[in-house]
Amino acid sequence: MKQYKILLIVADGLGDRPVSKLNGLTPLEAANKPAITDLLKNSMIGLMDPISPGIIPGSDTSHLSIFGLDPHVYYRGRGAFEALGAGATLSHGDVAFRGNFATVNNDLVVVDRRAGRKLEEGEQLVKELNEKIKEINDVKIKFYKGTEHRIAVVLSGKGISDKVSDTDPHHEGLKVLESKPLEDSNEAIRTAEIINILTRKVFDVLNSSEINKRRIEQGEKPANIVLLRGAAHYVKLPPFSSYTKLKAAAVSATALIKGICRELGMNVITPSGATGGIDTNYNAKAKAAIELLKENDFVFLHIKATDAASHDGLVEEKVKAIERIDRVIGAIIDNIGRDNLILMFTGDHVTPVEIKEHTGDPVPVLLYVPYPIINDNVGDFNEKEARKGSLRIRGLDVTNILLNYSNRAEKYGS
């Protein structure tokens, strides 16, 4: 029995709700999708709950689930994945945080949680932080540049804990929070103290940085604080190949996703021009996926643009992103051949552009196979048509479904 290559494409934040600017259509309905539409005659579609019905997924927990790992078992926090994706090498016991470069006033009240989002000087600021803040109370501190305004911070040393609260207030106009222990342990108390010292030191370094002085002169907001959240002890994940028997690779520019995929043992590629934003290089991502499909059984292609547009409320940009993803799918199919692979296209969660945050709605999912199946006889792929389809799955079902339809699944029982 022929075994097929597997291509899993996740458009981050793909799903949506009816949008007033689109006369009640969703971006997926409004988008022109000829390549996707052409696959429908040999596809099943439906809805996926990334975690379970009504649960609002993070991109971290949803991707763990999609890769076949129960987040209730394997999830300890996002910080470690962000750090791995940003290039950190973690050891057992390290505590990692995800964070944002942000703008605060002299009273540490947040003016902009993203320091304008675009931060071309990010690498220089990280270098300056690493040069000037190396250790606090015998705990080593290391900073890593993430995507756009994002940053990862790793604490290494004895007697530290991930049971501490965030310093990120999550809203502008509020003061940077004091980190507090989340359990009554010496390790948690000590770690919270270190984080609070770190917050002040980071502000002192960044607020006096010549880089930020130039940003102010140029009319830009200074990136003069790091807001921390998602503390996580490093816990090793099982390799993807150990439970799928697949040689796997991934294409992504987003630190979190790169971190998860690397930890799963996938070969992770970030092609030139791939940004993890709405300005990403779609052609480069398509070409990278095509090359990886030649050498791997499974290729995961992650595109962040749909989610970035949603969080900023950019309706037209989300529609354009979906149309560009459609062209990516068309280019891959044309190159690899529709008879040589199965393809799943979905999102990791719903991010409605009018809400600008994740919701617990089910996500539309499409599964194309290159051989005769009972298709769902729908005319389009969108949130409404998906409700007519045969698939009603959880994120945890995705990997098993892909193994089954690629003729790679093993029998359960005798």
Swiss-Prot record:
It catalyses: (2R)-2-phosphoglycerate = (2R)-3-phosphoglycerate. GO terms for molecular function: metal ion binding; phosphoglycerate mutase activity. Keywords: Glycolysis, Isomerase. The keyword Isomerase applies. Pfam families: Metalloenzyme (PF01676), PhosphMutase (PF10143). Its EC number is 5.4.2.12. SUPFAM superfamilies: Alkaline phosphatase-like. CDD domains: iPGM_like. GO terms for biological process: glycolytic process. Catalyzes the interconversion of 2-phosphoglycerate and 3-phosphoglycerate. This is 2,3-bisphosphoglycerate-independent phosphoglycerate mutase.
